[in-house]
Amino acid sequence: MTSPFTTTRRELIARTGMAAAAIGLAGHPALSVLAQHGIPQRPIPSSGEMLPVIGLGASKVVAQIADNGTEPVANVLRALVAHGGKLIDTWPRNAANDAGFGRVLSLPELEGKLFVTTKIDQVGKDAGLQQFRDTQRHYGRDVLDLVQIFSLTDLDTHWPSLQSFKAEGAARYIGVTVAQDSQHDDLEQFLRREQPDFVQMNYSITERAVEERLLPFAADRGVAVVINRPFMNGAYFDRLEGKELPAWAGDFGCETWAQFSLKYILANPHFTCVLTETSNPAHMEENLLTAAGPLPNEAQRRRMREFIATV
């Protein structure tokens, strides 16, 4: 079972300062907030366990282990942990990549400091069970923090299996994921009849379909919400290429387009953790520091929505 995050405040301050200097953020106002309070955290409703509000969506960087080795993902995870982050969201790929990721999880500086999630994406009960057991073996973990059904795949078959994993102590939490607006109705129906610990859904400044109903509904049901696609898998940056960040974004400490979307999400009270996918430790650090800085109020969020509608 994953241990609680144990970095001391003194260690956090020291690591934050070194990392910030490396990426040109020394003296940034968010650093003082981070040093005093750490990354903001929110509770998992079913247990009260706290999670930092920024996590790593690691499907791409883990999928590159067989070609690029383990050091790229290890470096991103070191940056995550150094700033108080802990959630890493994964998706089984193949034996070579997953076994390599297991070696990363066993590194002394990372062992016991990560909240590791995985997914089942197979059709059929036996295939799902085998995928879960393979993940346990490759990751070197008898207990996985969170097991999710990817995109509601074969939901009625796999959900009883996940409930068994949790009852047996092989999974601490269980849930489901979606990443497309077309799946939101099915997710809502699932939430009306079942009580997962977690759901994962797409949400950003440019994908706001869940904002008015599904996101607050999940929170009202006592379900932790993990946000994916904060940058629309890169399409967000393509849309804004060549556009200047409005000067008024500086009123809430926003300096980049990445921060523009992240700060919009972070100001929403109904989510638990937002996944940022990167293979660059400096970008991981910037994302974590964004969470420690000022956030837009509702009037500013409305202005953000109006601006995005024009580009």
Each PLM stretch: what is its role?
Residues 1-23:
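N-terminal secretory signal peptides and thylakoid transit peptides that target proteins
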Residues 20-24, 44, 213-311:
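Structured C-terminal cap/extension of enzyme domains
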Residues 102-117:
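Alpha-helix-loop-beta-strand connector modules within alpha/beta enzyme cores
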Residues 44, 56, 88, 116, ...:
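Conserved, mostly hydrophobic/aromatic
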Residues 59-70, 119-125, 251:
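Active-site mouth loops of central-metabolism enzymes
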